[in-house]
């Protein structure tokens, strides 16, 4: 859900940059060295998911997987997503350098919210209903939160002039809700079987 460069005015860009720096600082302070491989894994997944996208108005539609990453990384999604978004700007010109801070906040903030809402439910052995609840919840909050924040930023910056584009951006992400939720459930199931210790060690990222 990258917002394009040249859409937002300077005050919004500066506010996004300041908030992004604050989030990155918190994430780096809480990131432990033994968690770097997991952080890199989710950063790579976020990067790959965002490279397959369809431009829609002043944004784009693509898998986000931010809610899933937030479940396991907490505040560490800010530095993780920063690297992924920066590489997307450099190699594919997605978004832009000026809007990088805003895009980071749009993607990472819902991920942190998903972490606080669902991290306590993560267990190595989870019933199917719990995996569905956490996976779907993370997918909906991640994608829905990103869409809501992107819409809020656009309305704050452009008012009613962006109303139709905001509606288009939200409606076009309905399939992403479904796909992100399915993938999140699958990842939770897989990690519970192959890497169960990670399900018990989310506290340090909070």
From Swiss-Prot:
Gene3D superfamilies: 1.10.1760.20. NCBIfam families: PRK06265.1-4, PRK06265.1-5. GO terms for cellular component: plasma membrane. It is found in: Cell membrane. This is Putative metal transport protein HI_1621. The chain crosses the membrane at residues 6-26, 38-58, 72-92, 94-114, 136-156, 165-185. It is a multi-pass membrane protein. InterPro entries: CbiM/NikMN (IPR002751). The lineage of its organism: Bacteria, Pseudomonadati, Pseudomonadota, Gammaproteobacteria, Pasteurellales. Keywords: Cell membrane, Membrane, Transmembrane, Transmembrane helix, Transport. Belongs to the CbiM family. It comes from Haemophilus influenzae (strain ATCC 51907 / DSM 11121 / KW20 / Rd). May be involved in metal transport. One of its GO terms (biological process) is transition metal ion transport.
């Amino acid at each position: 859900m990258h917002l394009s460069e040249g859409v937002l005015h300077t005050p919004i860009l500066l506010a996004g940059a300041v908030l992004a720096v604050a989030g990155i600082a918190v994430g780096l302070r809480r990131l432990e060295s033994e968690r770097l491989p997991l952080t890199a894994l989710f950063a790579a997944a976020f990067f790959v998911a965002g490279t397959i996208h369809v431009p829609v108005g002043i944004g784009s539609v693509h898998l986000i997987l931010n809610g899933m990453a937030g479940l396991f990384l907490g505040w560490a999604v800010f530095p993780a997503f920063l690297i992924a978004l920066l590489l997307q700007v450099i190699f594919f010109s997605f978004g832009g350098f000026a809007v990088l801070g805003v895009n980071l906040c749009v993607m990472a903030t819902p991920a942190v919210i998903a972490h606080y809402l669902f991290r306590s439910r993560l267990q190595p052995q989870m019933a199917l209903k719990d995996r569905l609840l956490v996976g779907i919840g993370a997918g909906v909050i991640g994608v829905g939160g990103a869409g809501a924040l992107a819409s809020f930023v656009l309305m704050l910056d452009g008012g009613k002039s962006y109303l139709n584009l905001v509606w288009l951006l939200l409606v076009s992400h309905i399939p992403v809700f479904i796909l992100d939720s399915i993938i999140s459930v699958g990842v939770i199931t897989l990690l519970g079987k192959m890497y169960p210790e990670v399900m018990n060690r989310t506290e340090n990222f909070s």
